Design a protein with these regions (language model features):
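Beta-alpha junction/loop-to-helix N-cap segments that form part of ligand/metal-binding clefts
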Residues: 190-232, 236
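Extracytoplasmic "Venus flytrap"
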Residues: 137-140, 151-171, 175, 179, ...
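Segments of small-molecule ligand-sensing domains
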Residues: 21, 37-130, 380-506
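Hydrophobic alpha-helical segments within soluble ligand-binding/sensing domains
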Residues: 250-272, 364-384
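Flexible loop/hinge segments that line or gate small-molecule binding clefts
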Residues: 228-251
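Extracellular/periplasmic periplasmic-binding protein-like sensory domains
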Residues: 6, 10, 17-21, 29-37, ...
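An alpha-beta-alpha
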Residues: 172, 260-303, 307, 390-412
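Periplasmic-binding protein-like
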Residues: 208-217, 236-238, 325-336, 356-364, ...
Length: 506
């Protein structure tokens, strides 16, 4: 119960702050405040600390109420915490009343999102093209479609060190080709959060960017801060379930592709065991695992999926683990890794002698996604696309029906298996086949779906269970390797339940 959790968090916080003013509506908020202010969880606040924060609280309260905040279902503490994620306490304290009002105006969409129990709205397909009529010419609206755009891509790494960055760069070059003369793109590399990420996003905007894509979840903080400083710029971050209405987030429904590769794996397995490599227990990953297992069971009813995670400490090479168990069909990472064999990704077969044979792999058509978004901006549909969100943050989570997600099939697949995969691809793309529209039993024996209906996108994105065909578990925060914990703090399925001492900064 969130209310009970909030009560215990307040009881933990009060002895160090000794103030009743600060209240929040979201679990984890006290810990976030302490982290942002540089305080350890049990560190006693000095009288000066308390005076400083109370002064900020009253300063923000006055501006919040002047904006009509009294009618909203969020607290002054919620708004103060939001502001402190974007500005330092010194910056806030030095603002004039009019400047603070302007800052709050720029963040108002995010303030409205604070009162939502589910602050993220999932968009499952591209917006419909704008219909232009005679009145659009006689009485043009205030949101005029631009004739030319500058689009910037800010990457955490480079194409030579990251296949992920390379895929997004292919998408960027597609924009140059499709919108030649209308769109100009630029790329910025090696954006490190907490170091130069904010500066690189700012540089992109200084260089004239109208639209900025940041292609790593770790860049969401830099994206949010830039969006507040530059509300006229459209900023999108490649991540899931980020509750910030000032920016938009985007990802793909990988589980649809995993369902198809699972069916292929089941058909190609010589026995009843298949290996599966997962990276982080983040939003959407359990859905990927379950969809793969359900696809595999469709072609191999007695199959078991052996699940191995790469985010655990002292993790042995999963390929070695699987081969020691006699498992020869494996779903590996979704993209090639530097310094790894080029075929050790996607779903593959281990031949005698250790030779790897490609079977199939999920494939991202990022260019199609970027083309759809830029076309929406060019035709004036960006604001219209946002109008139905009811103050919530927008997360684009597009699937195979949008053309953004696909499955690459190996030419070495048997013809009958290729034919099956093509049927499944057509069915998933058309909506005739839903991977989760079936009876599903969890590992604990509970019925997760009766089979009379599918699961909605919110249920799929927040899935935190595994079906009964999977051997393995979803690791919790304490089990992860230290290097894996920052990503979990941002995208982990149980990130909001992290104890106080494990809270992270944005």
């Amino acid at each position: 119960d969130p209310a009970v959790q909030m009560y215990y968090e307040f009881m933990h916080f009060y002895p160090v702050m000794q103030n009743y003013l600060l209240t929040f509506t979201k679990p984890g908020s006290y810990a976030r405040l302490q982290k942002i202010l540089g305080k350890a969880p049990d560190e006693k606040w000095t009288g000066e600390d308390r005076t400083e924060v109370v002064s900020l609280y009253n300063w923000v309260k006055k501006a919040f109420l002047a904006h009509g905040g009294a009618r909203l279902q969020c607290t002054v503490g919620d708004v103060l915490l939001l502001l402190l994620r974007v500005y330092t306490k010194e910056e806030l304290a030095n603002l004039s009343p009019s400047e603070l009002s302007e800052k709050l105006d720029a963040l108002w969409d995010d303030v409205l999102a604070l009162q939502k129990s589910d602050p993220v709205q999932v968009s499952d397909k591209p917006a419909a093209p704008k219909q232009t009529g005679l009145l659009d010419f006689i009485l043009p609206g205030k949101h005029t479609a631009p004739s030319h755009l500058k689009v910037a891509f800010v990457h955490e790494r480079t194409p030579s060190t990251s296949s992920w960055t390379s895929q997004h760069e292919f998408g960027r070059t597609q924009l140059d080709t499709v919108f030649e003369g209308k769109v100009e793109t630029a790329a910025y590399f090696n954006a490190v959060p907490g170091k130069n990420a904010d500066a690189l996003v700012e540089q992109a905007i200084t260089d004239g960017a109208d639209v900025v894509f940041t292609t790593s979840p770790k860049l969401v903080g830099a994206s949010l801060r830039a969006a507040v400083r530059h509300p006229q710029v459209h900023i999108l971050n490649c991540s899931m379930e980020m509750p910030y209405a000032s920016i938009r987030t985007y990802y793909t429904r990988v589980y649809e592709a995993k369902f198809i590769t699972g069916a292929i794996a089941g058909a190609m397995a010589g026995g009843d065991r298949i290996g599966y490599v997962a990276d982080y227990p983040s939003f959407g990953v359990p859905a990927n695992i379950n969809a793969f297992a359900l696809g595999a069971r469709m072609t191999n009813p007695n199959v078991r999926i052996d699940l191995q995670w790469t985010c655990l400490p002292d993790q042995v090479d999963p390929l070695h683990v699987f081969t020691q168990k006699g498992i020869t069909v494996i779903s590996g990472r979704d993209a090639p890794m530097p310094n790894r064999p080029q075929r050790e990704f996607g779903t593959f077969l281990v031949r005698p002698g250790g030779v790897l044979q490609d079977l199939a792999t999920p494939f991202w058509h990022w260019g199609q996604f970027y083309e759809n978004v830029i076309r929406t901006v060019l035709n004036g549909g960006w604001v219209r696309d946002k109008s139905g969100t009811d103050g919530r943050a927008v997360n684009y989570w597009w699937g195979m029906n949008s053309g953004v997600m696909d499955v690459l099939l190996s030419r070495e697949l048997p013809p009958d298996v290729t034919h099956l995969a093509q049927i499944l691809r057509t069915g998933v793309t058309s909506g005739m086949i839903d991977p989760f529209h079936c009876r599903i039993t969890g590992q604990d024996g509970s019925v997760k779906n009766s089979g009379r209906h599918g699961l909605d996108l919110e249920q799929i994105a927040h899935m935190d269970w595994l079906c009964d065909a999977v051997d393995g578990h979803i690791p919790e925060y304490d089990e992860l390797a230290e290097v894996s914990k920052p990503m979990y703090r941002m995208q982990g399925i149980h990130r909001d339940l992290l104890p106080v001492e494990k809270e992270a900064e944005l």
